[in-house]
Amino acid sequence: PKDIVAVTMPCFGTTDKTLQNSLKLMEALGVTSRTVPVKDAVLQHFKDISHDENNKNAAYENAQARMRTLVLMDIANDANGIVIGTGDLSELALGWATYNGDHMSMYGVNASVPKTLVRHLIAYEGKRLGGAAGAVLEDILHTEISPELLPPEDGKIAQKTEELVGPYELHDFYLYHAVRWGFPPEKVLYLAKAAFKEKYSDDTLRKWLKNFYRRFFSQQFKRSCLPDGVKIGSVSLSPRGDWRMPSDAESRLWLEKLEEKP
């Protein structure tokens, strides 16, 4: 385990809970642990590009992710190692990653693992390991999914991914039926209504399906230059494998199908 260099890089949005969980997990797993705060480096970068640190726009958020990738790449060079990417299939489908930030690595181990499966894997591994590692993984499993790029509110996570882009259980369902089977939008929606009728309203399902198609099309440019990664399931978005799509493809025809009332 000591050959694995695990790095935590706290910045503006890092909560004490997630920081402590990362430190506890590294200790429990026995890996080499490093803490590299990037706040000062990002603030200096803001000065260099004349960005007001109070302007919490895309540059404010993405600069943190790109600074972290810079740190990881250079640590990897020093350690004569490679950067292992943490991004998963759901994030790639939605483009929920910073271009040349967490989007980039030297090998993406989770590239074909959807977020819902990630949750199951964490739960399984927590039970298998038990002890301190199991307790931390259990806590991580019940922590809101967040990139933590915006400052916390009262010490708690302010930026909650599933409130912004939609529930991952829906997006993974949409992705599977749209990509694996090539079903049209109206059929994907029909199946979602049958599968989730006890949990989500028809309007909610339609809303997040529209968002899925909008993001899936507009974010293809990030998938066109992915690091290598392993294919695990039946769906892959690698441009070198199962998925080839022009980055300027238009989602309009798919979205129009969802405007048609049954």
Language model regions located:
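ATP/NTP-dependent adenylation/nucleotidyl-transfer catalytic domains that generate, transfer
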Residues: P1-P262
